[in-house]
Amino acid sequence: MLKIYGSDLCPDCIRCKADLDAARVSYEYLSITEDLRSMKEFLKIREESAAFYAAKENGSIGIPCLISPEGEVSLSWEQYL
């Protein structure tokens, strides 16, 4: 199942969830601002994945972060619509 690390404080995360819901895409949403375990998991992924290079360079957090069932990391949800 698709996993999404995000926060309901983030407009992009809210839009991501709305778009995926409208497209009836199943996913597990992990809030990094409501659950420290999810925050720790996200930070580990962020440190290890090249997908975050541009986000780090721009000073962005890098959410929503999507993890495919195959383990691929992406910061773009449009590919799942």
Task: Map each language-model feature to its residues.
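Structural micro-motif
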Residues: 51-67
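Residues that form or immediately flank small-molecule/cofactor binding pockets and catalytic motifs
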Residues: 9, 32-34, 71
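Non-catalytic, surface beta->alpha helical segment in thiol-disulfide oxidoreductase systems
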Residues: 65-81
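Local sequence-structure signature of Cys/Sec-based thiol-disulfide redox active-site neighborhoods
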Residues: 1-30
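Amphipathic alpha-helical interface surfaces
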Residues: 16, 38-41, 76
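Thiol-based oxidoreductase modules, predominantly thioredoxin-like and allied folds used
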Residues: 26-48
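Generic structural signal for secondary-structure transition and capping sites
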Residues: 47-51, 71
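Short, glycine/charged-enriched secondary-structure capping and boundary segments
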Residues: 19-20, 44, 80-81
